[in-house]
Amino acid sequence: MVLLRLLVFLFAPVVSDLCSLPCFINVSESQGPGTVLQFLSFNCSSYTPTPTLELLNVQPPTTFFNPPSLARWQGTYVGKLTLSSSAQLDALMVNHYKVQLKFTCGNHVMEGSLSVDVQRDLSHIQCAGQFASPAGEMIQVPETVTPGARLYTLLLPGLELHGAQMSIISAQDLPHFPGPFSINEQGWLQAPSQGLLGQAQKVFQLQISVSFGQRQSCQGMVIVKVLPVPSSQVSFLEQAQNITIPENLAPGSEVVQVQARGVDLRYEILSPVPSPLFSIGRADGVVRTTTPLELARTSGTAVSRLQVKAFEQGQLWASAKLNLTMNVQLVNLWPPRCLPALLVSQIPETAPVGTVLNTLTCEDPDSVGATLDYKLWFRSSSNPASLCLYDRVLEVNATLDCDTPGACFQHAASILVLDGGQPQMTTEVPVLVMVTPINEFSPACAPRTFRVQEDAAPHTLLGSVVGTDMDYPHDNIEYYTSGGPTTFAVDRLSGEVHLLGPLDYEQQRLYRLTVLVIDHGQDQNPNHHLSGSCTITIEVEDVNDHAPECEPPFQELTIYAPLGRSVEVTKMSCQIPQEPQRLIYSYSIVGGNSQNRFILQGAILVHSDLVLGPFWPEQPRTYELLICVADAGPSTPHLSTTATIIVHLVPRRASTVATSTHRTTVPSTMTPMLVTDTEAFWQPQPWFVVVLTATGALLLLALGWLLGRLLQGLAQLLQAPSKPAQALLLNSIQGTEGSIEGFLEAPKMEMSQAPSSVMSLHFDGRAQDSRTGRDYLFNTHTGARRWL
């Protein structure tokens, strides 16, 4: 019978702890296909998708187990694990299987292992194999075998633990036998004490009886064939080997492959028999494990000594022996465990060297109290000297100043914890150190001087104030003005200085503006700001924006100039009232100086007749001179004004008195008047022009279409006139004779529609219209009329 155990696993909604899975179940080797090995009960509140139970793998690999089934019964999911159709359990071959299962309930997944131990079945023990067959088990031994040597080992699985009794029941009488063969309780068939020399080619049949339990026995036959001295030699390259293997080798794992020299060799383990931990491949000599080698659970497995025999197939006397020592080494199964599993620290960048960030506590589950090794490994490219690890304490090793180029606000590292086991196990503890910025330095800006012309337009860019801040992020500052004139403004982000209002060089030539720079975003406290200031000087450059004015602007002079002499006519007095400091002007005659009789010497107008000769006028003459007065100097642009001087020149014959000048000036109150003519014009929006153009085009198209239709109808009427149409026209004329409109339009209609047939009508009467008094002719038959 199979031992069935119902294990209930409580889930929320699935089992949350893998340790609740069963550890071991026992099954008899006599169980065959379809045998139920285990029922598993699961609670799952998820119905979509349907819960599943899967078989992930089996160690050692085998096909003896069916995929588990899962069914719902009374609100609980019951899984069932059974043996497959190929199952042939044999405790001597493999007595332990590890089945890995996986249960899925919705998004929750649980994996666990089930250990299956195969148990021997005493009722299944019997003589089997060639030994129990009618032909028996044949062995071949050389005649040189040592007297009393072990020739054969009778293996009856399971009987070694139940005191089986073995004896040879066949006759061994002389002279057919050199001496009696013997067999002990361990199943060792031994050669006669006399040896087998001289018994070559002889065959000895030995009937062996095996008794065990209460009245249980079986019989078999061993046939010993004695062979002559072998012609070949079997040997190993070395007589002994020491092999070290880890304890975590799975059953069936290869340990070592032994090789001997010889022909058609076979291998077997001579001792211990049976071998509980190892087996050897008969043909390939590969030594494998048959059971887990866990030192903590199985005593006596640390060191195992095996004796391996290599022999030729068919010539058992041609053999050699090899001693193997198996050293099972303790395996380091668990890495160190550390608390906390993640180190996260936050410190200001001004933290001093030696500040303790965190302390790590670790232990080795495989060896409590063992010494562990700690190493600090940096993940990021930040300065590795910023942090250090003293034993288990993480400290600040160097300044964490983050004002230098390169981000240093986060240090990612790992602490590697290594144990001293084999293989060496390592635990990695992630370390994340976040450095918070501190606003340490006040921003600053350098004084600047900007120059701007007084005619600069508003919003003109004068320059930029450049502020600096040593805190990271660098130069993350804002600009403000502290008092000062409102004529200028500073951009808050860029520091650009713009002109807001008009300037006048004559009123103010120098401005001083205090700019305040404030940093932001450089401290974990958003309200912690530092500030600085600097003075900006703005110099206004003069621009020539006023034309000169002459006093008086108009003069009328009469001069008497003798022949051959130059006469000073007048000296002009011009200045710019708004700029009294400007004293340099240029003067030029731009009109009225016919024959070049006048010249300017600075501001003095001079009449010169040195070059006149015979062209001296006989009669007095008047000259209207236009004098252009412009400001001079480096200021641009140069502005000018025009003064008018009327000179009445009296020739030398006109008077005999001394030369004199008569001045007539325009009073200063009579200043030129500046007339501004503003011409108003209408400039429509572009969309209005487009709409108006489209509307006009559509209107022209409509008028053209209408005109075409009228012309077409008129042409048809003129080309094909009919009498009914003419009569209708005449009747319409008669119907409107009482109205003024009919009176006015009737002649036109008669004239426009006067075909030959109408014009040739005979009018036999004449009458006068009672309303209008006009005379008309009429036809008494047709009623047609013709106005006179």
UniProtKB/Swiss-Prot annotation:
Species classification: Eukaryota, Metazoa, Chordata, Craniata, Vertebrata
UniProt cross-references to InterPro entries, sorted A to Z: Cadherin-domain_protein (IPR050971), Cadherin-like_dom (IPR002126), Cadherin-like_sf (IPR015919), Cadherin_CS (IPR020894)
Stated role: Cadherins are calcium-dependent cell adhesion proteins. They preferentially interact with themselves in a homophilic manner in connecting cells; cadherins may thus contribute to the sorting of heterogeneous cell types.
Protein name: Cadherin-related family member 4
Subcellular location(s) of the protein: Membrane
GO annotation (BP), single: homophilic cell adhesion via plasma membrane adhesion molecules
Repeat is among the record's keywords: yes
Record bears the keyword Membrane: yes
Membrane-crossing residue ranges in chain numbering: 687-707
Extracellular side: 17-686
Predominant location: membrane
Any one GO molecular function term: calcium ion binding
Disulfides per UniProt: none
Membrane topology category: Single-pass type I membrane protein
Domain Cadherin: 237-338, 339-449, 444-554, 551-674
GO cellular component: a single term: plasma membrane
Signal sequence residues: 1-16
Glycosylation sites per record: 242
Source organism per UniProt: Homo sapiens (Human)
Residues in the Cytoplasmic compartment per record: 708-788
UniProt superkingdom: Eukaryota
